[in-house]
Amino acid sequence: MLNVMVKRKGLTRLLYATYYSLKGLRAAFLSEAAVRQEVFTMLILIPVTFLLEVTSIERILLIMSLLIVLITELLNTAVEKLCDHVSTDIHLLIGRAKDIGSAAVFISLVLACFTWLTILW
C-alpha cells in the first residue's frame, strides 16, 4: 500500500497551511507553559506599545522582539517534542539538542529585554 502525499496548490494549499499552522500553535499553547506565558505577555505588551510615545519603527521593533521570542520558543518546543519521540532515555546528544534550543530561547529573551530597555530608556 502506497502512502501518496497530495500536493495542493494555490488557495487550497494556503488554507491547509494556515490550518496546520494554527493547529501547531494550539498544540504548543496547550502543552507548554512557556508558550502560554509568552502569549499572555504579548497580549499585554503589544497593546502597551500603542500607548507609548515611540516612533512607528520603534513600535515595530518592540513587537518584533516579542514575536522572535515566541518563534524561538515554538522551534525549541518542536525540537523537544521530536527528541522525546526519539527517546525518553537520558542521552548526551538529545540533552545537548534540548540545551541548545533552550539557549536560543534565552538569547531571544535577552534580545527582547535589550530592545525594550534601549527604546524605553
For each feature predicted by the language model, list its residue ranges.
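Hydrophobic alpha-helical transmembrane segments
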Residues: 1-78, 86, 90-98, 102-121
